[in-house]
Swiss-Prot record:
Cellular location(s): Cytoplasmic vesicle, Autophagosome membrane; Vacuole membrane
Induction: Induced during biofilm formation.
Protein name per the record: Autophagy-related protein 8
Superkingdom as given in the UniProt entry: Eukaryota
Gene assigned in the entry: ATG8
Lipidation (Phosphatidylethanolamine amidated glycine): G116
Main location per the UniProt record: membrane
Pfam families hit by this protein: ATG8 (PF02991)
Similarity comment text for this entry: Belongs to the ATG8 family.
Molecular function GO labels: phosphatidylethanolamine binding
GO terms under biological process: autophagosome assembly; autophagosome maturation; cellular response to nitrogen starvation; endoplasmic reticulum unfolded protein response; mitophagy; protein transport
Length: 135
């Protein structure tokens, strides 16, 4: 999915800003957070974040939930390069693995698991009786 932030700001400007941030804030990573297009979830009020390196993905999701005022019973999924990052992973680890060539980490959020990755599978209706040694 194309980033609106990338569309609005030329590569050189984004790269210079990320480099300036990295030099000035050694304990933070620059993150762009945008809603997945056509998602039924509220729009976030700001896209640019300086996230502490020791924050987990789960803690960052909490920040997003608060900013969009999402009730606790509503689901939210975040994606980095079309994958669901583990909630226990540090943002700094995700940043090192998935940062864009401009120096920003691009995070998308949605109310649906848009990219089709299975989180859990209901196996209650499956029949395993024909598998040898199945307990």
């Amino acid at each position: 999915m194309r980033s609106q932030f990338k569309d609005e700001h030329p590569f050189e400007k984004r790269q210079a800003e990320a480099a300036r941030i990295a030099q000035r804030f050694k304990d933070r990573v620059p993150v762009i957070c945008e809603k997945v297009e056509n998602s039924d979830i509220p729009e976030i009020d700001k896209r640019k974040y300086l996230v502490p390196v020791d924050l987990t993905v789960g803690q960052f999701v909490y920040v997003i939930r608060k900013r969009i005022k999402l009730p606790s019973e509503k689901a939210i999924f975040i994606f980095v390069n079309d994958i669901l990052p583990p909630t226990a992973a540090l943002i700094s680890t995700i940043y090192e693995e998935h940062k864009d060539e401009d120096g920003f980490l691009y995070v998308l959020y949605s109310g649906e698991n848009t990219f089709g990755e299975k989180l859990a599978i209901d196996i209650s209706s499956l029949d395993f009786s024909d598998i040898p040694d199945y307990v």
